[in-house]
């Protein structure tokens, strides 16, 4: 294996490097040092369980992420939680609402600061993607959500007649946009989350008949592809109060793929983070459990999860400390 010292002894290579630097700048080609930080900067998903499934503690910065699934499965909720987490770190987030369906009241309830959220409601697909490109190139936005790919309708299709053929227009538009965007997204360290829907393939007799909209380009350029599916409903006093949601990482370029988890999304509350904290803190022995009794640092909390929830809500300093410990465990694992 060639060492770094041997690289600088190769005169032909040094000449090539100088030519590349002259034409394209110093950052066009680099050699990393032993002590350089190669860990991924991330934005938390807002769910400890999802952060753990992703494998690096959240959505990687400077990458494309696709969250897809059937309708009403929790896709937008996951994206809004990511926005809330970015804002907690003092970063700027944007929401490109191609569906024109963003519920600001719901976003506020799950922690989004709507007063500092940039929102665009474009009229057609090219406009949405141009806005996305401009925001990414500003190098000022940490997270951009596009909701959704299915709603990115090309201008030609919108202005044409209902009888006009428009096969492949959206796929070509997405392919061109992602080819242009991929490099600048990486350089700007912007995380771009595309929300996508599932469609039925026509005439499929064998295999999975479901596919995502927008062609194959998004599948190719995405670092993470996360599938979400609604599971059982949780009912209290005859009223549905929450849903179990299965989250599966079907593509992962930064950690081991195909990990999956089960989260709970409450109506008007979003991801039930406290339940996750109790589950994982018990798993990692941060919380001690003996039978039905829970304790923390030898302090008895009470019997059952409801007692722990109440205790955590009354002791925000202890909650913050447990969250910090959990993040350390997830990063190490």
Curated annotation (Swiss-Prot):
Can catalyze the hydrolysis of ATP in the presence of single-stranded DNA, the ATP-dependent uptake of single-stranded DNA by duplex DNA, and the ATP-dependent hybridization of homologous single-stranded DNAs. It interacts with LexA causing its activation and leading to its autocatalytic cleavage. GO terms for biological process: DNA recombination; DNA repair; SOS response. Signal peptide: none annotated. Belongs to the RecA family. Keywords: ATP-binding, Cytoplasm, DNA damage, DNA recombination, DNA repair, DNA-binding, Nucleotide-binding, SOS response. It is found in: Cytoplasm. The keyword DNA repair applies. ATP binds at residues 69-76. This is Protein RecA. One of its GO terms (molecular function) is single-stranded DNA binding. One of its GO terms (cellular component) is cytosol. The lineage of its organism: Bacteria, Bacillati, Mycoplasmatota, Mollicutes, Entomoplasmatales.
């Amino acid at each position: 294996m060639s060492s770094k010292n041997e690289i600088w002894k190769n005169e032909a290579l040094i000449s090539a490097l100088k030519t590349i630097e002259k034409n394209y700048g110093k950052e066009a080609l680099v050699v990393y040092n032993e002590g350089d930080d190669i860990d991924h900067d991330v934005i938390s998903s807002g769910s400890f369980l999802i952060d753990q499934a992703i494998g690096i503690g959240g959505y990687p910065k400077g990458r494309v992420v696709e969250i897809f699934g059937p309708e009403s499965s929790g896709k937008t909720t996951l994206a809004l939680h990511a926005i809330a987490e970015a804002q907690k770190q003092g970063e700027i987030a944007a929401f490109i609402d191609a569906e024109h369906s963003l519920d600001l009241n719901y976003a506020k309830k799950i922690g989004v600061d709507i007063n500092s959220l940039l929102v665009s409601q474009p009229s057609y697909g090219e406009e949405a993607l141009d806005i996305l490109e401009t925001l990414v190139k500003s190098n000022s936005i940490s997270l951009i959500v596009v909701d959704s790919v299915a709603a990115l309708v090309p201008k030609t299709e919108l202005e044409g007649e209902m009888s006009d053929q428009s096969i492949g227009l959206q796929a070509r538009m997405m392919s061109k946009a992602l080819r242009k965007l991929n490099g600048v997204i990486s350089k700007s360290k912007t995380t771009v989350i595309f929300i996508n829907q599932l469609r039925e393939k026509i005439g499929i007799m064998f295999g999975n008949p479901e596919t995502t909209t927008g062609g194959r380009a998004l599948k190719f350029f995405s670092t993470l592809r996360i599938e979400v599916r609604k599971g059982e409903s949780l009912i209290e006093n005859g009223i549905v109060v929450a849903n179990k949601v299965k989250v599966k990482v079907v593509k992962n370029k930064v950690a081991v793929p195909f990990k999956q988890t089960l989260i709970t999304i409450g109506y008007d509350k979003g991801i039930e983070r406290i339940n996750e904290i109790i589950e994982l803190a018990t798993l990692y022995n941060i919380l001690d459990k003996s039978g039905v009794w829970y304790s923390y640092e030898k302090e008895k909390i009470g019997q059952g999860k409801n007692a722990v929830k109440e205790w955590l809500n009354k002791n925000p300093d202890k909650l913050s400390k447990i969250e910090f410990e959990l993040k350390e465990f997830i990063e190490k694992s």
